[in-house]
From Swiss-Prot:
Keywords: DNA condensation, DNA-binding
InterPro entries named in the record: Hist_DNA-bd, Histone-like_DNA-bd_CS, IHF-like_DNA-bd_dom_sf
Keyword DNA-binding: yes
Family, per entry: Belongs to the bacterial histone-like protein family.
Disulfide bonds: none
Name of the molecule in the record: DNA-binding protein HU
Role description: Histone-like DNA-binding protein which is capable of wrapping DNA to stabilize it, and thus to prevent its denaturation under extreme environmental conditions.
Encoding gene, per UniProt annotation: hup
GO molecular function terms noted in the UniProt entry: DNA binding; structural constituent of chromatin
Biological process terms in GO annotation: chromosome condensation
Signal peptide: none
Organism, as annotated: Clostridium pasteurianum
UniProt xrefs under SMART domains: BHL (SM00411)
Length: 91
């Protein structure tokens, strides 16, 4: 399912127009992004948790030249599915 299909599905299930469903989805995504930028967790009970984790600096290797390169530390977004969501998917 792509973004357009998700918007259509949201509109049908919520009796919103596609435009309103698109605005709602954009607002949700922006709110999650803003919270993660501040280092906050976003917990949606029954669905899952969005959070950030620190990935340590490490050495990597250029596959073409075999040269060792340093990969800097970075912060990455992570989603952990909740139990109800996992159970529904594994039905």
């Amino acid at each position: 399912m792509n973004k357009a299909e998700l918007i259509t599905s949201m509109a049908e299930k919520s009796k919103l127009t596609k435009k309103d469903a698109e605005l709602a989805l954009k607002a949700l995504i922006e709110s999650v992004e803003e919270a993660l930028e501040k280092g906050e967790k976003v917990q949606l009970v029954g669905f899952g948790t969005f959070e950030t984790r620190e990935r340590a600096a490490r050495e990597g290797r250029n596959p073409r030249t075999k040269e060792v390169i340093n990969i800097p530390a970075t912060t990455v977004p992570v989603f952990k599915a909740g139990k109800e969501f996992k159970d529904k998917v594994n039905k």
